[in-house]
Amino acid sequence: MDMRSGDREFPNGDFYSGEVKGIIPNGKGKYAWSDGTIYEGDWDEGKISGKGKLIWSSGAKYEGDFSGGYLHGFGTMTSPDESVYSGAWRMNVRHGLGRKEYCNSDLYDGLWKEGLQDGRGSYSWTNGNRYIGNWKKGKMCERGVMRWENGDLYDGFWLNGFRHGSGVYKFADGCLYYGTWSRGLKDGKGVFYPAGTKQPSLKKWCRSLEYDDTGKFVLSRSASVNVEELRSLNTVTQSLSVKTSAGETTCDPPRDFTCHGPVSKSARFSGSGQSEGQDKNRIVYEREYMQGVLIRETIMSSVDRSHKIKPPNRPREVRARSLMTFLRGEHNYYLMLNLQLGIRYTVGKITPVPRREVRASDFGKNARTKMFFPRDGSNFTPPHKSVDFSWKDYCPMVFRNLRQMFKLDAAEYMMSICGDDGLTEISSPGKSGSIFYLSHDDRFVIKTLKKSELQVLLRMLPKYYEHVGDHENTLITKFFGVHRITLKWGKKVRFVVMGNMFCTELKIHRRYDLKGSTQGRFTEKIKIQEKTTLKDLDLAYEFHMDKLLREALFKQIYLDCSFLESLNIIDYSLLLGLHFRAPGQLNDILEPPNAMSDQESVSSVDVGLTQEHSIPPKGLLLVTHEPNSVNTAPGPHIRGSTLRAFSVGEQEVDLILPGTARLRVQLGVNMPAQAHHKLIEDKEESATIELFEVYDVVVYMGIIDILQEYNTKKKVEHTCKSLQYDPMTISVTEPSTYSKRFVNFLHKVFPEER
């Protein structure tokens, strides 16, 4: 069809002038809508495509690439407020590399995704502050560096616009703080180096932040950085009688985008007096914070500290063992890929099978599924990037029913473990040499098993299934799958998938592994890090609970211990996680309540550590359970009824954390208590100042390590150690004694109110 030029005026007042193909705009042309919007540029069979310029009646204008009626390619958009974006577009939204200068002269230069900052980018504020690092959905996330106009600098991790995770804060005057943050507030242990003291290498620290113990930091979704969600432009219609989308949809509404303010001076310095005779250049402070409140401080020598300091959250070294050595590096990567492939295959195969009650044959030796996964794929398996491997799945029907019993959706289970975000290797808290992996959403822990542990698990599985089915509140480890991978060079690796007892958005400040024995049950202070799992002799608290909550707890502990005793199991322990709540009246003194403020919101306050503090007010509140009001669900591996509390008229209860969440209280999950600090004589800790004696805590717990039988080897170990130590103090002992000692010890940890 011949090309020709012409003008055409439409009944609604629109006007077109330019080249046409038949009656359709094609080539160069200009279209004016009746409201004043004008496009001039290339057309392709009735669609705006190619190079062009679009000016909306609102005053917004775009000049650049179009495709199929969309802003698509590279172009520059000037909004009515004079903010300018120049960069990549995809389907009417900013997507790719781009630079935006805001109307107040703030500047962002970096990657965009679906209209929001996402990826690497730099944001400069007009007041001189600047952030360089990662972004996610318009907010500062993951690794990034913030430098304030006053010279302060923070290098570390972020989440939803907050300082969150490991980081180092360097003050303009030379002071330095290494530690962890939670939603913009210091939370957990850290080290403060006054100006002039010997400080660890900042360069080395920054490199170490590339490695994190969990690989992610998942807490509150609340954010303080509010970047507008851009509304997509409507497509430019093919019909010439309908106008192009209005330009105002591309303009940014007034921005509410502020940066973190520098840490207040009151948060830097201790108010405790220093002896004039002390060498201030040698003194550093090991501090512990709780939601921004300083609760504990230890004065140390920088010389003593220099060889101890390790960046928080860096995986600690584990002594080499055959399995650990084998699974280093490339082999470990292949192993994770194989595990994900195998679980995807297993769940996909068993899910369509109609649900039924398990039979004796479902536990037997023939209850195994085997499959070979060649690299190039087969009729039953997909091609993959790992090495050839063989997969064995144990008792698939049993574990399918267990997953359903704990209300785990098959698709969500696969996505948690087999999703694109993958698995994260975490350091082992024990001496077993096992390797632990954490799912990307923290819901599941995967642990390597010894052959003997696998055999114990399979033998106990029928009774375990019965016990878990009869007791919905059991504290015993939840097992969701047992698998074996045989790599092409013959190495066999066995895995068990378990529920993560600490799957919570609350920060776990303390972790304890409690057995009730005392011989060797302590942690050397030089080895204690932010996420170290402590032991019996390290526990300096006793926990006071509501009467009915405590009764429910010990009722289940008795049942679980009796079950383990009947199976001849020993060496199990109570894994205890504690979330401390900060004393509310100090939040405004020791740490700025709004860490996102552009300027310091707190003046310098001299806070003395030696002054007396009254018992803090309750940071927790039990209220009658309201299913529709609970905004944070318990971990996905938890089932059972909501607990009742004596203090609320024996009603089912929720736990309110003021300003944080309303949580459903279940056995071992979200259980409130008061932690009473016990005074312990310890010369090494004479420089430690404990600010409070009573804390509100949220308790998480479960019974773990239940795969050790009291066999001949353990009997010999008990006999030998009994010759050296008091038999009641050593961990290894016969099952009935172990059970009684374990329960008696927990009675001391959770004493009955008098």
UniProtKB/Swiss-Prot annotation:
Nucleotide-binding among keywords: yes
Start and end residues of each PIPK domain: 329-750
Keywords: ATP-binding, Kinase, Nucleotide-binding, Repeat, Transferase
Catalytic activity annotation: a 1,2-diacyl-sn-glycero-3-phospho-(1D-myo-inositol 4-phosphate) + ATP = a 1,2-diacyl-sn-glycero-3-phospho-(1D-myo-inositol-4,5-bisphosphate) + ADP + H(+)
GO biological process: phosphatidylinositol metabolic process
One GO CC term on file: membrane
Residue ranges of the region described as Activation loop: 710-731
Stretches forming MORN repeats: 16-38, 39-61, 62-84, 85-107, 108-130, 131-153, 154-176, 177-198
GO molecular function: 1-phosphatidylinositol-4-phosphate 5-kinase activity; ATP binding
Domain of life of the source: Eukaryota
SUPFAM superfamilies (alphabetical): Histone H3 K4-specific methyltransferase SET7/9 N-terminal domain, SAICAR synthase-like
Protein name in UniProt: Phosphatidylinositol 4-phosphate 5-kinase 7
Gene it is expressed from: PIP5K7
